[in-house]
């Protein structure tokens, strides 16, 4: 059976949420971020402003640029609403970020109903959040991802098969292929490889020898629409966690606690959403030196008490010796159980 894979991507997610909160910002160039741009509105992108750019550089490109602070609590709340909506359709979902994910629809819809499903899906997202998303449907994750980028924003595109996929992308610049970033694109340009069709000139062994096994195989397979990656949904939950890498490292304890609070809220929401309990907690911290440390604690009983878990994790994070600025922070609940063993024991003895 041919797979039906969908990729959705919320349009300028953070910026669009801020416009929803303040409609006067509509059609104005704005970015969300403090020192670094995390999201730019489509009006700001007309000035070549993009994510990961310094806010100071963005202001040089657009002196009238509106800069708003990041409100992760609100963004995560809305992201959770979207996740809950999708999980009512199927559990075969891989959420790759707060604003995008892959959905395996193979067992959900008939092939002839792809377009109708996409239109209904986009409508449901709009009704729920007043936000728009771009959607792609393909025969694997690669084709779905590329399809979702074709008619952004608020568009959709469907690849029915490999032949259609190859025909569509052959004349596109090679950077359309996932994994071809700015640096690799420059390397390929120096080798006179500008377009997807240029890759077809070379056999697999040449590409592997020239660019390494991972890059070479990715180029060879991707231009042909070959991708065997599965949508990585969790069949059995053993742990629930989230981590974040910071473009600007966290410099002091107040910044660390601020980000910890945000990660804890998001991770705890996932614990509740999955209707499970935890009996161990873990904090992961990576410094700018790339030294990585984890600290864990086994709890005396399984629980999903928010206050209890927060206090235990707060103690744990404060036990770290701050060697350097923090580049990555992670929060995890482990030893997941479907029931509260302490409560079951109490009920049994009543």
UniProtKB/Swiss-Prot annotation:
Domain UmuC: 5-181
Positions annotated to bind Mg(2+): 9, 99
Catalytic activity: DNA(n) + a 2'-deoxyribonucleoside 5'-triphosphate = DNA(n+1) + diphosphate
Keyword tRNA-binding part of the UniProt annotation: no
Site residues (Substrate discrimination), renumbered to this chain: 14
Pfam families from the UniProt entry: IMS (PF00817), IMS_C (PF11799)
GO cellular component: cytoplasm
Active site: 100
Endoplasmic reticulum is among the record's keywords: no
Cofactor(s) required for function per UniProt: Mg(2+)
EC number: 2.7.7.7
Keywords recorded for this protein, A-Z: Cytoplasm, DNA damage, DNA repair, DNA replication, DNA-binding, DNA-directed DNA polymerase, Magnesium, Metal-binding, Mutator protein, Nucleotidyltransferase, Transferase
Subcellular location, record wording: Cytoplasm
SUPFAM superfamilies: DNA/RNA polymerases, Lesion bypass DNA polymerase (Y-family), little finger domain
Record note on cofactor: Binds 2 magnesium ions per subunit.
First-level EC class: transferase
UniProt-listed GO biological process terms: DNA-templated DNA replication; error-prone translesion synthesis; SOS response
Entry GO MF terms: damaged DNA binding; DNA-directed DNA polymerase activity; magnesium ion binding
Subunit composition and interactions: Monomer.
Family: Belongs to the DNA polymerase type-Y family.
Function (record text): Poorly processive, error-prone DNA polymerase involved in untargeted mutagenesis. Copies undamaged DNA at stalled replication forks, which arise in vivo from mismatched or misaligned primer ends. These misaligned primers can be extended by PolIV. Exhibits no 3'-5' exonuclease (proofreading) activity. May be involved in translesional synthesis, in conjunction with the beta clamp from PolIII.
Protein name: DNA polymerase IV
Organism (species): Fusobacterium nucleatum subsp. nucleatum (strain ATCC 25586 / DSM 15643 / BCRC 10681 / CIP 101130 / JCM 8532 / KCTC 2640 / LMG 13131 / VPI 4355)
């Amino acid at each position: 059976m041919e797979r039906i894979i969908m990729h959705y991507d919320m349009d300028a997610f953070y910026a669009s949420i801020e416009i929803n909160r303040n409609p006067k910002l509509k059609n104005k160039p704005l970015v969300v971020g403090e020192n670094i741009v995390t999201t730019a509105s489509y009006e700001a992108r007309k000035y070549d402003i993009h994510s990961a750019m310094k806010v100071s550089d963005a202001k040089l490109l657009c002196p009238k640029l509106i800069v708003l602070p990041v409100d992760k609590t609100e963004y995560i709340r809305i992201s959770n609403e979207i996740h809950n909506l999708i999980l009512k359709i199927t559990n075969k979902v891989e959420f790759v970020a707060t604003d995008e994910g892959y959905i395996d629809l193979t067992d959900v819809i008939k092939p002839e109903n792809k377009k109708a499903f996409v239109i209904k899906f986009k409508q449901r997202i709009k009704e729920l959040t007043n936000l728009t998303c771009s959607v792609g449907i393909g025969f694997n994750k690669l084709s779905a991802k590329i399809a979702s980028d074709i008619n952004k924003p608020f568009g959709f595109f469907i690849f029915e098969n490999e032949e259609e996929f190859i025909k569509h992308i052959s004349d596109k610049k090679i950077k359309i292929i996932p994994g071809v970033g700015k640096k690799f694109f420059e390397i390929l340009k120096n080798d006179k490889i500008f377009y997807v069709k240029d890759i077809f000139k070379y056999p697999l062994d040449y590409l592997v020898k020239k660019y390494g096994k991972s890059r070479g195989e990715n180029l060879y397979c991707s231009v042909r629409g070959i991708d065997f990656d599965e949508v990585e949904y969790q069949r059995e939950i053993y742990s629930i966690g989230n981590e974040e890498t910071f473009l600007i490292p966290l410099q002091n304890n107040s910044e660390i606690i601020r980000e910890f609070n945000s990660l804890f809220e998001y991770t705890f929401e996932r614990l509740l959403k999955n209707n499970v309990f935890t009996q161990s907690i873990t904090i992961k911290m990576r410094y700018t030196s790339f030294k990585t440390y984890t600290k864990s604690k086994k709890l005396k009983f399984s629980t999903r008490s928010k206050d209890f878990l927060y206090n235990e994790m707060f103690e744990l994070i404060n036990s770290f010796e701050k060697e350097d600025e923090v580049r990555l922070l992670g929060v995890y609940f482990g030893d997941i159980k479907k029931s509260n063993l302490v409560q079951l024991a109490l009920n049994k003895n009543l």
